[in-house]
Swiss-Prot record:
Disulfide partners: none
Signal peptide stretch: none
Location (main, coarse): membrane
MF annotations from Gene Ontology: transmembrane transporter activity
Coiled-coil annotated residue ranges, if any: none
Localization annotation: Cell inner membrane
Protein name per the record: Autoinducer 2 import system permease protein LsrC
Topology in membrane: Multi-pass membrane protein
Induction / repression: In the absence of AI-2, repressed by LsrR. Induced by AI-2, via release of the LsrR repressor.
Role according to the record: Part of the ABC transporter complex LsrABCD involved in autoinducer 2 (AI-2) import. Probably responsible for the translocation of the substrate across the membrane.
Pfam family, one: BPD_transp_2
Record organism: Salmonella typhimurium (strain LT2 / SGSC1412 / ATCC 700720)
Length: 347
């Protein structure tokens, strides 16, 4: 049972999503609708994109806490260029390039300069946030063109063009990780760095690629953010890095690297966003959101840790069982006889 849960974390996340629909649905039948599904998905698109990027980094046994600032910085560049008269495709392309460059810089710090990922990305978190504020002077960016907002308008089955793009991108990344040598390199790097090097995997380039892809996903998240709300606050992206990591952990991505899937991370992002919608239904104040999300994350971490310990004990038991010979019938009979004599003496 424990092994099944560990090997099917996506199913566990999906079950949690279903339960989180059923229980509120018992209180309000209108909650159980396709409209609710699409509404939560629309709200989860930003976090899903960030979770895809975080998956790539976490698979290599690293972590990036600068994606929130990268998202904000890229959103600001998009807004500045659009208000300066650049076309939407050009502005989006420049935004994507900026995100990839920001991620590449993180990767260089970690892979080539050997700075611990948490330290390097904490530094760039402040750097990218500072660049964002310098560009805007601390002001909000408003007056974005209608063409940008149109990207988030429903086009089919209540899902926007950006929503369909997010789904296709998630499926593509899931396929790349599961079915190609490119994806297996990420797992190998995170699972056994030295072993991957001996097999010829260019682990430094894999990690740089992971951070670069993460930056690209953060840029896409910035575009989605701007298109959904129609303006860019000066605190755009704040706190998103923790939610992205939480979504990955909820979906079964190991903090120790080398295991997990993009689909699990997507389901984790959906579940976290769904919690917010349930809190609204229950009329719980918004300031409880972070507390409850953190509580859920801690619960999952504790469960994940206990599950891993139980699996390791089971593996050790199976590994050394062949060295422990079972007792012979004569030994069993002698032990039983000795126990009976001991019981008589006590009586």
């Amino acid at each position: 049972m424990l092994k099944f849960i560990q090997n099917n974390r996506e199913a566990t996340a999906l079950l949690a999503i279903v339960c989180l629909f059923v229980f509120p649905g018992a209180l309000d039948s209108q909650y159980l609708s396709v409209q609710t599904l699409t509404m939560v998905f629309s709200s989860a698109q930003i976090l899903m994109l960030l979770a895809i990027g975080a998956t790539m980094v976490m698979l290599t046994r690293n972590i990036d806490v600068s994606v929130g600032s990268t998202t904000g910085m890229c959103a600001v560049l998009l807004g500045v260029m659009l208000n300066a008269g650049y076309s939407l495709p050009v502005a989006c392309l420049a935004t994507l390039i900026l995100g990839i460059v920001a991620g590449f810089f993180n990767g260089v710090l970690v892979a080539w300069l050997k700075i611990p990922a948490i330290v390097a990305t904490l530094g760039t978190l402040g750097l990218y946030r500072g660049i964002m504020l310098l560009w805007t002077g601390g002001k909000w960016i408003e007056g974005l063109p209608a063409g940008l907002k149109q990207l988030s308008a429903p086009v089919f089955l209540g899902i926007s063009a950006i929503g369909w793009f997010t789904l296709v991108l998630a499926l593509l990344m899931a396929w790349l990780l599961a079915k190609t040598a490119f994806g297996r390199n990420f797992y190998a790097t995170g699972d056994n760095l030295q072993g991957a090097r001996q097999l010829g995997v260019r682990t430094e380039m894999v990690r740089i690629m992971a951070f670069s892809l993460n930056g690209g996903m953060a840029a896409l998240a910035g575009i989605v953010f701007a298109s959904q709300i129609g303006f860019i606050p000066n605190q755009t992206g704040t706190g998103l890095e923790m939610k992205a990591i939480a979504a990955c952990v909820l979906g079964g991505i190991s903090l120790l690297g080398g295991s997990g899937t993009v689909i699990g991370a997507i389901l984790g992002a959906y579940f976290l966003t769904q919690i917010d919608s349930v809190l609204v239904l229950l009329r719980i104040p918004a300031w409880w959101n972070d507390f409850i999300a953190g509580l859920v994350l801690l619960g999952v971490l504790v469960f994940d840790g206990r599950l891993r310990c139980a699996l390791q004990r089971n593996l050790r038991r199976q590994k050394y069982a062949r060295f422990i010979s079972p007792p012979t019938p004569l030994q069993t009979e002698a032990k039983t006889h000795a126990q009976q004599n001991k019981n008589k003496e006590v009586a």
